């Protein structure tokens, strides 16, 4: 069972309740705070499940449905459209954080986290994870971890217990390298990736990449 790490983080006991009120005690198979994904397991057979869709194929303007348990209103479904892909919010403060959210206007509130975002075919395209709101309740913007990221994380957690990922060992300038940004950074290059910092003894450092390089 896929959910968000922040849903089960620091929990002493986790119970999964089905729509028919059947309850199962869940075991944590693994967590990945950098993507806010967690994998649980319950001892049960024949449970219904969703098929993964390829989240890379999701199109802007596509209709989606968000399923969840907002404010303990079980089996709530809301509809919206995809308005952005690969959205970064800066909500995950981990140095290894990976944010590439699908943005939608489907209503998501506290209690929706870890729920499914599905396409019109009922296929999983994301895991509802966050909202952007001054009040803590839905104000028009919600965000989901794409299914392709969730699928990779879940596969690694099942096989290895942790997520396997490579690390280049560099920090990149987040803004697009325009002439104005290039002038601010003191470089003549106006395209590419500006290396803001290099981690000592990392893969990039060993390859000769230095702070201030443009790749």
What are these regions (language model features)?
Residues 1-191, 196-201, 206-207:
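Serine-dependent protease modules
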Residues 212-215:
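Conserved catalytic motifs of ABC-family nucleotide-binding domains
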């Amino acid at each position: 069972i896929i959910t968000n790490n922040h849903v089960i983080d620091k929990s002493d006991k986790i119970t999964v309740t089905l729509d028919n009120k059947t309850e199962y005690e869940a075991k944590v198979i693994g967590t990945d705070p950098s993507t806010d994904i967690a994998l649980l397991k319950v001892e049960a057979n024949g449970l219904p499940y969703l098929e993964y869709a390829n989240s890379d194929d999701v199109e802007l303007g596509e209709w989606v449905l968000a399923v969840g348990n907002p404010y303990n209103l079980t089996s709530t479904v809301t509809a919206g459209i995809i308005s952005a892909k690969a959205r970064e919010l800066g909500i995950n403060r981990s140095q290894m954080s990976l944010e590439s959210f699908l943005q939608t206007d489907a209503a998501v509130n506290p209690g929706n986290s870890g729920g499914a975002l599905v396409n019109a075919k009922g296929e999983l395209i994301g895991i509802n994870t966050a909202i952007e709101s001054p009040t803590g309740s839905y104000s028009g913007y919600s965000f989901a971890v794409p299914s392709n990221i969730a699928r990779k994380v879940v596969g690694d957690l099942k096989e290895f217990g942790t997520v396997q990922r490579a690390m280049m060992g560099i920090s990149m300038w987040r803004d697009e390298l325009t002439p104005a940004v290039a002038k601010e950074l003191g470089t003549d290059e106006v395209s590419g990736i500006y290396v803001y910092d290099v981690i000592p003894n990392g893969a990039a450092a060993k390859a000769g990449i230095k702070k201030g390089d443009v790749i």
